[in-house]
């Protein structure tokens, strides 16, 4: 398995997994080196996309692992890789959010993320929990 920065030829595969932003924005994120992919040989089986909250704080926007690869530690590997890169880039902490009713919150808490607040977006039925991790 390999974790690498996404490039333009990965765009269509990434769009398949990332329906949280408009497909035109995916190319922009790739260009700005904000997307990592997990590859099994040449096949993309995971995607991690982030942005900069307030243009200064790395914020995880998406972590997706193909269903056949879940529960095998690849999500943890992608998170650790991203955190390592952010540390190298001299960031002191990273942030993310997930819905209160999603099991992902337990995954992030096991990785050392701590809850720093929550809000209820009008389009959701559950609170969106904000997390922070010191690097």
For each predicted feature, which ranges?
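Conserved catalytic-core motifs of GNAT/GCN5-like acyltransferases
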Residues: 95-97, 114-130
